[in-house]
Amino acid sequence: MRPKISIIGAGFVGSTAAHWIASKELGDVVLVDIIEGVPQGKGLDLLQAGPIEGFDVKITGTNDYSATAGSDIIVVTSGAPRKPGMSREDLIRVNADITRDCISKAAPLSPNAIIIMVNNPLDTMTYLAKQVSGFPKNRVVGQAGVLDTARYRTFIAMEAGVSVEDIQAMLMGGHGDEMVPLPRFTTISGIPVTEFISKERLDAIVDRTRKGGGEIVNLLKTGSAYYAPSAATVQMVEAILRDKKRVLPCSCYLEGEYGLNDIYFGVPCVLGAGGVERVLELPLNDEEMALVKKSAEAVSSSIAALKAM
């Protein structure tokens, strides 16, 4: 029997993720959305691409959560984007309501699933998903660092004039302006990145990475990134379903790692069939640790705002 992946939210990120999951034949896909006709139409459209692209999986579009029963993975992409004039608290309130609704309906139907959160504010919504689902910490994880690291690697490859395939990089922290790219742990085919790029240019790349999502929002005018976010999500899905033990930066629940507690935070982890199989603690220097602490304060503040609601 093929694995079953349920994607909650049939917007750009959800439907693009469904496409890549199907094309990689990672499993059968259930696409869920509250808008009648949208998941059904996108699901049917995607199914009809199968004969052309050469994939053969079952794709179901639905407004009914019962179709998600027995899922191996639940991906939550549904959420409202931050609009002009909207405070961080406003965004938390709106998306917390959506997340509670999605998780309370999907989790009981798939008690052994692994949940991958993709909606924003990412670390806070992942924290909420763990609370609402009651799942153990290893089976609730947030997708942020894979995307942020991909942006970082892309900018480094552009600057160095080399293949993006040869950039190895790590990034930590909350998904936002306080993320912590780690140049000291960045190499080009094992060669320190500082052999290719000056500190000044590297600092500029780090800054651009932090603002990576906003840069695309500003260019699009309406909407936000979806190709890279969905690709990042599918990389995590594949790592879990194929038990690849990938070392990826993900939003994980911490209990003492890096001196942090009761927080979802972007850290390197081993991702496999058990979900987050272990968190890796890097030997950070004082400067890096200070940036991590600052980032953690921003995430903790967001989680505190959630708890106060």
Curated annotation (Swiss-Prot):
Residues involved in substrate binding: 82, 88, 120, 151
Keyword NAD included in the entry's annotation: yes
Catalytic center residues: 175
Keywords: NAD, Oxidoreductase, Tricarboxylic acid cycle
EC nos: 1.1.1.37
Residues engaged in binding NAD(+): 9-14, 33, 95, 118-120
Pfam families named among the record's database cross-references: Ldh_1_C, Ldh_1_N
Top EC class, one word: oxidoreductase
SUPFAM superfamilies for this protein: LDH C-terminal domain-like, NAD(P)-binding Rossmann-fold domains
Annotated catalysed reactions: (S)-malate + NAD(+) = oxaloacetate + NADH + H(+)
GO molecular function ontology, one term from the record: L-malate dehydrogenase (NAD+) activity
GO BP terms in the entry: lactate metabolic process; tricarboxylic acid cycle
Family, as annotated: Belongs to the LDH/MDH superfamily. MDH type 3 family.
Function: Catalyzes the reversible oxidation of malate to oxaloacetate.
The protein's name: Malate dehydrogenase
Native source organism of the sequence: Roseiflexus sp. (strain RS-1)
Gene name per UniProt: mdh
